[in-house]
Amino acid sequence: MPPRYPFGGGAQSDEAHHQPLERRTTAEAQGNSFTHGHTAYPTYDMGAEPHSPPHVSYDPYLPPSTSGDHSGYEMPSANYNDHHRSSYPQAIHSPPRMTNPYANSQPRQGSADPFDEHDGDVPLLPRGGNYAYAPASHFDEHGNHVGPVDKYADGDDDVMDEDAVNGQARGRLLHTQVPHDDDYMPGGFDPNVLENGQAGGVRFGKIPQRVPRRYKTLKRVELYHGNLVLDCPVPSKLLDKLNDRESREFTHMRYTAATCDPDEFKTERYTLRQVLFDPPRRTELFIVLTMYNEDEELFTRTMHGVMTNIAHLCTRERSKTWGKEGWKKVVVCIVSDGRLKINSRTLACLAAMGVYQEGVGKNVVNGKPVTAHIYEYTAQLSIDPSMHFKGREKGIMPVQILFCLKERNQKKINSHRWFFNAFGQILQPNICVLLDVGTMPRPRSIYHLWKAFDINSNVGGACGEIVALKGKFWGALLNPLVAAQNFEYKMSNILDKPLESVFGYITVLPGAFSAYRYIALQNDAHGQGPLCSYFKGETLHGGQSDADVFTSNMYLAEDRILCWELVSKRDSAWILHYVKSAQAVTDVPDQVPELISQRRRWLNGSFFAGIHSIIKFGYIYRSSHSFGRKFALHIEIIYQTIQLIFSWFGMANFFIAFFILTSAMSDKIHALKVPNLVLSYIYVAFIIFCFLLSMGNRPAGSKAGYTLAMVVFALLTVYMTGAAIYLAVDSILNATGPNGGGTDALVSNRTFVNIVISLAATFGIWLIASIMFLEPMHMVTSIVQYLLMAPTFVNVISIYAFANINDISWGTKGSDKVMTDLGVVGGSGNNQVEVAIPTESKDINDAYDDAIHVLSNKAPKAGPGPVDKEQKQKDYYATVRTNVVLCWSLSNAALVVGILNISSIGTRTIYMGFLLYSVAGLALFRMMGSTIYLIKRLFSGE
C-alpha cells in the first residue's frame, strides 16, 4: 500500500533530500563527526534508544525504514563556517517540470476551466470537491510519483509555489480571474466562524493542516546550558528556491524555548546565533517589528519594506559600514504578542520564508513553562503584499531574522522589553529601529535614519515622517477621515517636528517608525534611566500597581516618557532629531470608532505626559547639555505650555468663535437672529450629547451617535465659515463704497482685520511652508476635509478622551494558565530531555506545504465582529475621572460665560482677535523653526 504522506518518500527514498543516498550518507557521517568534535555544545543527533518507541503515534502506513532516521536535528554549532555545510545540490535556476494533481478531475458545473487560462499552472483553487484531497493516488506502492507532468509558465517574477501535492509546481498564489468560492478554509472549519466562536473565517495561533500530521519522532537531546535549543533543517522544497545552500544559517532554523522573563534572558545563559559565529557578528542595526493579530498583507507590507531597505544597504559599496556583506550587520526581530493571537496566514508567510516550522515549539521544558518561542533563520526570500516570492534576482539580500512568538498576550510594551532587555543584551547593537507591523518604510528610509546617528554622535533618538496610506490613485482621500488625518500628518511633519528637532527635544518619537542609540537608552549603575522609566508602564497597566490616575494616563504615552527621559538623562547630552528623508507609509483609521479609540489614548497620554515634562522640567539641569541647548529647551517648554493651555480651553474657544461670528452676521441680517440662536442651542445640545455618549458608550457600540455628532459639527463649521466670508466681503464692500472711506476705513475695521488678516496669515503660512518642503498637494486634496473635521477633534474626541481617563486598559494582564497543546518536554537525567519533533523530510515538507496552501487560497472577508456581551464599564478611578471632567467642563463653561455674557461687545471682538492672531502667531513660530531646520539640513548632509 502506498504511504499516506508521500511527499519526498521515506528515509530510503532519494526524494527525501533531493540527493543520492550515498551522498546523504557521507554528509551525515561528516555532520556527526563534526558535532562530536564540539563537546561544549549539545548534540541533537543522539538517536533513539533501542527500547524507545520510534514515534509518538504509530502509523500503519509509515514504511518501517523511517523509524530509525533521526538525523534531522543536530547541534547549534558555534562555528557556522565552511567545515560544516549541508550537502544539498547547487541552486537550480530553471525549475523542473511540474506535476498537476488535478489533471484527471472534472471542472465544476457552470465554471470556467482554470487550466484553459493558465496553460497548465496549478490553480490556486481546485475545481471541486474537498481541498483535503488524497494525494496517495498519485504514488505507487514504493512511494514513487506516477502522476501527470505539469507545465511551467515563465514570468517576470519568481512567484510563490502553489503546492497542491509535491510542492514543486509554480504559480501565482492569488489568481483573481480563477473562479472560486469562500466556502472552504484549510483544516476543515467553517470560514465564517473562528475556533473561539467569532466571525471572520481566519484562524489564529497555528497554521491549519490539510491532513493531520502523525510523523513525530521521540528523540533524546541534550540541553544547551540547561535550555532547549534545536537546530531544525528547513524544508528541502524551500532550499530548492535558494541561491545559497552552503551555510548552515540557510539550511537550518534554530529554535529556542525561553522559560524566563526577558530581563533574565542573558543571566539564564540563553544566546543568539550572531554571537556563535566565528568571529561573532557585530550588529549595527537591530530592527524590531511588533505585531498582534495583523493579517498577511500588513505583515508582508512591512517585512518586504524592511528587506528592500536592507538590500539598499548592501548596494552602498563605498560605505565604510555597509556594502555587499552589509546584511550580516542587520538583525530583524519580529515579536508577536501571544501565540494564540497571531494570524495563521501571517504565520504561514513566516513558514514559507523558512523562519517558522509547525510542530517544533513546546509548552513546558523540565517543568518550566515556556514564555517565548524563539526562531532564528537567515531568509533569502521575501514575500511582497501581492504574495510573490522575491529573491536574489530581484535584488533581495539575505536577512537575519529573529522571530519571537510570545506564549501569552502581554501587550506591545512587553514586546519591546524582549527586544531591548533580552535580545539587545546579547547582540549589543548600535542603533535600534522600532516598527509596527502595517508600517512600510520606503526603500532608503532606514539608511537615512541610521545616517542621522552616524553624522551626529549626540543624537540619541530619531524619527522619520509617517505618511498616511492614500491607496491606489489616492482613492483613500475620498474618505474624509483619511483626508483629514493626511492633512494633519503632513502639517505636523512640516511645522511641528522640524521645530522640535531644532530645539533638540521632540515630544514624541512615534513607535511606528523611530530609532534609538542603544547605549543612550541604558540605565545607570543604580538601575535608573530611560528604559527603567519606559518599562514602568508595563507594570502600571498589567494590574500589578496601584498607581494614581495621573501616572497611569501618563504612561499611556510611554514613548513620550522615553523621549523626555532620554533628553534629560543624568550626566548626558543626548538630543532627538527629525529625519525628513526617512519616510514610512501606514494606514490610518478609516472608521469613526477606530479613530475615536485611537485618539483617546493619544490625547490622554500626550496631555498627562506634557504635564509631566513641564513639572519635571528641572531634570534638564541634571543633564550635561550646553547653556545654549538648555536655553533653547526653556523656549520650547514655554511653547509647549501655551499649546497645553489652548488644548485645555479648545472646546470653549471654538464655541466662542462660532457665537461671535454668527452674532455679527445677525447684526447685519436681522432675519437670521432667531435661526442663529437656534443653531447655538443645537451646538450646546450636541456638546451635552457627546458627554452622555462618552460616559457610557463605547465608540464601536454607538457608531451612529458619534457619526451624527461629527456630521452636525461639520455642518455648523460650514455655516460659521460662511459667516466669516460674508463679514469679510461686507466689510470690503462698505469700505470701497461711495461713503466707505477707502483703504483707511478697511484697515480700521476691527472685524475685517481680525478675520481676514489673521486667517490669511494662517493659511498663507501653511501654504508657504508646504511649498518650502516641496509638498503642497495636501493643501489641495485634504484641507477642506481637515477644516470640516476640526470641530470633531476639538469637541467629540476631546470629550471622549477626558470622559474616559479612567480607562487605562491599554495593557492587560495576561493569562497565567500554562498551555500544553504544543507538548511537554520531560527530563531523562544527565542534562537530557525527550522531545517529540518532526524529523522526516516528508513531514517537514508537509508542514511547509500547509503554509503554502494557506497562502494559496484567498482569505475570506471578515464580517463585523460580535459585540462582547461580557464587556462592562470599568469603574477604576471613577471619582478622579468625575473630578477632572467637572474641572475641565466648568472651566470651559466659565470662559464662555465670561466672554459672551459678562463682557461687552468690544471685549468679545478683542478676544476673537486674540484667538485668531494666536493661531497665526503659533503657526509663524513653527514656520520659523521649520525654516531653520531646512537650512541646517542643507549643510548637514542628510
From Swiss-Prot:
Residues 1-124 are annotated as: Disordered. Its EC number is 2.4.1.16. It comes from the Eukaryota. One of its GO terms (molecular function) is chitin synthase activity. It is an enzyme of class 2 (transferase). Residues 27-36 have a biased composition (Polar residues). It is a multi-pass membrane protein. Induction: Expression is up-regulated in the mycelial form and shows a maximal expression in the log phase at about 14-18 h of incubation. Keywords: Cell membrane, Cell wall biogenesis/degradation, Cytoplasmic vesicle, Glycoprotein, Glycosyltransferase, Membrane, Transferase, Transmembrane, Transmembrane helix. Polymerizes chitin, a structural polymer of the cell wall and septum, by transferring the sugar moiety of UDP-GlcNAc to the non-reducing end of the growing chitin polymer. This is Chitin synthase 4. It comes from Mycosarcoma maydis. The lineage of its organism: Eukaryota, Fungi, Dikarya, Basidiomycota, Ustilaginomycotina. The gene is CHS4.
